[in-house]
C-alpha cells in the first residue's frame, strides 16, 4: 500500500490555498487587518515553511491564534479552541459543530465559520491554479502497477475528489 497526500504532493495547490484562502480568511474572521502582513507571513511559516508544514487546518489555526493572542490582540475563548484541538477525536467541521452544540463557545463558532469560508474561498480559486504537479499522473500510474495506492489528506474531501477527478488521478487509486 502506498499512501499519497494530495495538497503539496500530488496537487500543486498547497501554497496557493494558504496564500489566498487559509491565512486571509483568518485575518478577516478575527479582524486582524492592521497586522495582516506579519500575521500572514507567520501563518505561511507555520503551515508551509516549517516542521509543521501540512498540519491540519485547526491545529494550524490554534498555533497561529495562540501567537496572535500573545503578540497582537487578545483572542477571546482561545482556550476553547486549543482544548478542542488537543482533545477531539476528529479535527473536522462536523466534530467542531458538535463541540459548539455542547459548549456554545464563540471562539469555536468563529473557527467553524473560518473553516467554512476557507472552503468557499478554495472553491472560488481559478481552476488554472489547482493543478497536479508535472508527472503526478505518470508517477501514480507507475506506483499502481506494483501496489495499491490510497489518497490520504486532511484537505476537504469534496475538493480532493474534484481536483483528482478532473485530472484523472483517481484512475490510479
Regions found by a protein language model. Name each.
Residues 161-173:
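Extended hydrophobic/aromatic segments used for targeting, binding, or gating
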